[in-house]
Amino acid sequence: MTMKSIVITSGKGGVGKTTVTACLGRALAELGNRVVLLDADFGLNNLDVVLGLENRVVYDVADVIENRCRARQALVEADTRNLFLLPSAHGYLGNNVTAQNIKLVLNGLAPTFDYALVDCPAGIEAGFNRAVGACDSALVVTTPHISALRDANKVVALLSSYNMQPTLVINRVRGDLLASGKIPSKDEIETLLKATVDGVIPETDGVYNLAAMPKKPFDMLAKRLCFGTGEPLDPAADYRGFWGAIKRRMKRS
């Protein structure tokens, strides 16, 4: 199997992109894939924190590019079998940390891994171009709110200049609001952004680490990426019908 490199990106910050990267990586690894997560959000990186690996980091991707260590020396093994982190650089980035050189690092890891997920900075500036230029495909993370969808639409359009047809992950979806029609549905978002939704992640209050995140929606997303099968999770399923209407009223109270 040829390694697939996927950039996880978003137009708007704060949509949960880094958490999606970590949870999707875990789900892919639990399907038996060898997965490396590369944190390309230089300066604002926290993928190591979400994974609970911040105290194990010795080298980072800049050290690899600057030949201060080999790529395998910089890898940090996560608690999930087959899941590894290539940490982001802290502080000043030299001129050698480019999309081309990040891609060379990924190419060097390709014989060992099935998937490389690259956590991209929010926005569409230099960090975006560096991360996207190193990858072959893209997942755009958004929430079902108008400001996030507007920014995601810009990112989807921009990715076409890289000859990418990204798919979408809709994060932080409240099932009660979806069932009552107060936020757009999966189909409506697909029509708006002209892209396929591969994953729908329900809202989870106060969860910021990998161990506490629900696994089911990410397992479903991983199976769609690996096998092209199944449908994304429907967070509104429990809020439809007679009893669902009661649950919606209780949610509002």
What is each PLM-predicted segment?
Residues T2-A40:
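Walker A/P-loop phosphate-binding motif and the immediately C-terminal alpha-helix
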Residues A29, V132, S160:
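Gly/Ala-rich phosphate-binding loop of Rossmann-like dinucleotide-binding domains
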Residues L37, V118, V140, L168-I170:
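Structural beta-sheet core signal
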Residues F42-L44, G91-Y92, G123, H145-I146, ...:
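Conserved nucleotide-binding/hydrolysis micro-motifs of P-loop NTPases
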Residues S161-S253:
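C-terminal lobe/tail of nucleotide-utilizing enzymes
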